[in-house]
Structures are given as C-alpha cells and as structure tokens.
C-alpha cells in the first residue's frame, strides 16, 4: 500500500494533522506513507511512526498540479507516472475549483476502487482542528474520538536534547516568549513576573527559554537576561524533533498558540497557554494537561495572577 498526503502549513498545522496520520498508520501498519508539505515541520513524523518520506511542496514539480495550459500536468510525464503509483491520495491542500482533483481523476483516481483520491478543506471548520483532519478519512471507514497528537522522539533526538541541556534528565520549565504575531503574544514583562514567582516556589527547577526567529532579538538583550532566574538555559535554532525531546524533559511549558506549544503537548508536557484572537476550542492542543487562558481577542486581558495560578496547578500535579 502506497499513500500520499498533501498537507501544507506551519509547524502547528502539521502537528494537529498527526491524529489523522495515526489513523492511516493504524489501518495500514505496513503502508509506505509519503507527505508533500513543509519539510521542516514534517520531519517530526519522518521515520518516527508516521511518515516514510517527505517532499517539499515548493518544489517546481508540485506546481503542475491544478495548473492551466501550457503548464498543465500530462499523463505521459514521469511526475504523473510517479503520482499514479500511489493507491490512496489524501489532499488537504486548497483546491477551490477542483483542479487538483481533476488532475488526479485524469490519472485514474476515483472515490473508490484501486486508486482513491480524497479531498478535504484546508481550513478547519470542526473543533478541535485535529478532528477536522480526521474527518477526511471517514469515507475510508476510519474514525476516532481521540484527537490528541503524539510524538515519539528517537534515541538520537533524546541524545541531542540532553547535550543541549547538559543533563540526562531532570525537571525543567520551558518558556517560549513569542508567537510570530504581536496580537497573539502576551507581554514579556508579564511572563517574567510569572517566572520569578515560579522560580521562588521551585528552586530546583531549571528554566529553559526557547527562542525562534521571531524572538532572536531577545537572545542578545542583556537586560532581559538579567531578569531571568540564575538557573536558566536559553536555546535557539533547534530543529522540531530535538525540541520534542527537550520538552520531554520539562514538567511545564509556558507560551501561546504556537507550533512549539503543540510539540510540547504531543510529548505529554503540561502546558499553560495564553490565547488572544485565536479560539482555543479550535487551536489549543486537546488533553487534560492543557490549560488555555483567554478573555476575548485581546491577549493582554489575561492577568498575571491567572497565569501564575494555572502554572502552580500544573506543577502541583506533576
């Protein structure tokens, strides 16, 4: 069995697709499953129980799908022959006019039979988001009520995480201060107020600050560094699979509606997440260890005492 999944999006978008990929793997445990999408995100599932190969969706060949003449896909070209080698194609790419479905139909894919093509809207309309992507598989007889994403770091991932933290285990608190969007980001000073209180409560725990591209300026901000607890490790530039292993060593993740938050939840780390304009019913990772705090679209309306209380609850349970 060969399966191709077309799924774009950022890091969090991939992680919320994992329950659907898990359904495919459970139904066809020995299938060869490939994905065309964001390779830096999809590496989380590559050779880690979900995917056997990943293709960057921005490669020129993928632009042939759904294209008009003279760039339209031809049945006799090698790319078309390769696509036709799959028995099942799941499309989560936008296809408003059905052009991608048309091309796969030209290659002999139907709604049933020896070559099956299933298309589903790219934008979730069912909460949580993972449920939306699982719904695409219902015509195949696949269904679930478990929408929690799960990641499985390898021994190499864990070794890399241990080297980054200079420890083989222990209890850490992870904090990702950014979100990629100012409207989704709780003020840094408020986070620092929470962290100082937690540091006083839990002197034995190390703070791990995770910085992405959007927060790179904080790494060089000496004033901010002075505000952090003494036992603080600042990490930047780690690939997603190493982040997953790092979060396995953490008892709490503090952050927002971000890809790293979804990764942390997927390895079982308890999370306290501050939400603003995005709906946590749709975008917060589902699960009992997740506390999503929100008061409407203004992220600033969430208070320091609320976040501190949620963090203390999470740490008290771990």
Regions found by a protein language model. Name each.
Residues 1-318:
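Catalytic machinery of carbohydrate-active enzymes
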């Amino acid at each position: 069995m060969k399966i191709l999944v077309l799924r774009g999006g950022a890091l969090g978008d991939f992680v919320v697709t994992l329950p659907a990929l898990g359904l495919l793997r459970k139904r066809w445990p020995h299938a060869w499953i490939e994905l065309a999408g964001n390779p830096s995100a999809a590496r989380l599932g590559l050779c880690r129980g979900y995917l056997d190969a990943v293709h960057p969706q921005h490669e020129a060949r993928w632009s042939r799908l759904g294209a008009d003449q003279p760039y339209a896909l031809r049945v006799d070209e090698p790319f078309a022959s390769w696509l036709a080698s799959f028995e099942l194609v799941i499309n989560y790419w936008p296809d408003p006019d059905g052009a991608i479905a048309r091309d796969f139909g030209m290659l002999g894919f139907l709604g049933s039979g020896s070559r099956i093509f299933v298309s589903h809207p790219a934008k979730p309309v069912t909460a949580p988001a993972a449920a939306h992507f699982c719904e695409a598989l219902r015509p195949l007889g696949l269904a679930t009520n478990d929408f929690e994403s799960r990641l499985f770091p390898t021994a190499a991932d864990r070794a890399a995480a241990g080297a980054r933290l200079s420890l083989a285990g222990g209890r850490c608190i992870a904090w990702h201060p950014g979100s990629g969007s100012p409207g989704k980001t709780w003020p840094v000073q408020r986070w620092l107020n929470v962290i100082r209180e937690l540091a006083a409560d839990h002197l034995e725990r190390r703070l791990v600050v995770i910085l992405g591209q959007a927060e790179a300026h904080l790494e060089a901000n000496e004033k901010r560094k002075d505000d952090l607890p003494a036992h603080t490790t600042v990490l930047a530039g780690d690939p997603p699979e190493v982040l997953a292993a790092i979060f396995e060593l953490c008892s709490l993740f503090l952050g927002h509606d971000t890809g790293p938050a979804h990764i942390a939840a997927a390895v079982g780390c308890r999370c306290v997440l501050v939400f603003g304009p995005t709906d946590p019913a749709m975008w917060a990772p589902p699960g009992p260890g997740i506390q999503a705090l929100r008061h409407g679209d203004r992220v600033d309306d969430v208070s320091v005492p609320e976040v501190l209380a949620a963090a203390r609850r999470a740490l008290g349970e771990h």
